[in-house]
Amino acid sequence: MQVPKCEICDDDFSSEEDGDHNPRNLKCSHTLCEGCIKKLLKNGRVVCPFCREPTEVPVYNIKSLHKNFSLIQMIKIVTKTTEVEKNWDNFPPKCVEHPYNVAEFACIESNCSSKNKLMCQTCEEFGAHKGHAKELLITKTDKFRKKLEFWINQLKLNIQNCTVKKNELEEAVVKSEQLLNIKVKKIKNHFDKIRQSVDKKEKGIIDETTAEATRIQKFNNEKITYLIDLQARHVKDIEAIEKQKNMTDIDLYNTGIDLPCFFGHLNIEVFRPADTKEMDIKLPNFKFEDGS
C-alpha cells in the first residue's frame, strides 16, 4: 500500500504532529497539505482549487483548520503495514522438505551432496543433512553482508583513488599543454632569429656581389665605348688615306704623307675584360637534409 498524496503538490501526506505535509480539511471537506494551504492563503481565506469554495482562515492561522484525522490514522496503518512487510520479507523461508518448519539453518558440511543447502531442525536430525555442520542462516548472511560491505568500501576507496589519479593526470595534461606552448614559442623565436640573421647575411652577400658586378660592367662598358669611338676614327682615317692614295702622282708628290698623323691611332693598348675574381663568394656552411 502507498501513503496518500496531496493532489496539488503530489507529496506524501505525513502523520507527524508538525510539518508542511499534515493533511488539513477545508470548509468544503477537501483535504490539502499545510504547505499548499500556505501558498493558497490570500486575504485571510483559501479558495479550494477543486470546487472553488472559499474557506476563512482567522488571523492567517492555518493551524485553526481541522486535521483530517481519519486520513492520518490511515497513513499510520499503511506505514506500519509497510514496515511489517519489509520485516516479513527478511524472515527465514519455509523448509522445502518440511514446509511446516522454517529453514533457519544453512548447511556448511564440505561433503554435503544435497543441492538445497537450507535446512530446518528436522532436516538436521532425520533428513538429508543429518549430522551435518550447520550455521544459522542469519549468521551466514550477516557474514555475506559484511563481506559485501567490505567490497563496497574497497570499491569506494578505489573510486576515490581513481578520482585523485584522474585529477593528477588532468593537471599533468594541462601543464604539458602549457609547457608545449612555451617550448613552441621558444623554438619559433629561435628560428625567427636564425631566419633574420640568414636574410641579413644573404642581403649583404647579394649587395656586395651586385656592387662588384656593377663595377666590372661599368669598366667593360667604358672600354667598349672607347673602342667603338676608335673604330669610327679609323674609318675616317681610311677614307682620308684612300683619298690621298687616289691622287695624281704630282698631287701626291706635292702633298706628301704624314705617317704619324695616321699611325698614331694604331698604337693602342690591348683591352681585356675586368677581372671577375672579386665576384667569387664564399657561402656559409650549412648541412641540408639531402646532404648537399
UniProtKB/Swiss-Prot annotation:
Please name the GO terms that the record assigns under molecular function.
Answer: transferase activity; zinc ion binding
Q: What happens when the gene is disrupted?
A: RNAi-mediated knockdown results in increased levels of ced-1.
Record-level GO BP terms: protein ubiquitination
In this chain, Zn(2+) is annotated as bound at C95, H98, C123, H129
Alphabetically list the UniProt keywords.
Coiled coil, Cytoplasm, Metal-binding, Transferase, Ubl conjugation pathway, Zinc, Zinc-finger
Of the GO CC terms on this record, one is: cytoplasm
Q: Where are the zinc fingers (RING-type)?
A: 6-52
**Protein role:** E3 ubiquitin-protein ligase which catalyzes 'Lys-48'-linked polyubiquitination of ced-1, promoting its proteasomal degradation to maintain appropriate ced-1 levels for apoptotic cell clearance. Acts together with E2 ubiquitin-conjugating enzyme ubc-21.
What's written under domain?
Answer: The coiled coil is required for interactions with ced-1, ced-6 and ubc-21.
Q: How does it assemble?
A: Interacts with E2 ubiquitin-conjugating enzyme ubc-21. Interacts with ced-6; this mediates interaction of trim-21 with ced-1 and is required for ced-1 ubiquitination. Interacts with nck-1; the interaction is required for ced-1 ubiquitination.
Q: What is the recorded name of this protein? A: E3 ubiquitin-protein ligase trim-21
> What organism is this sequence from?
Caenorhabditis elegans
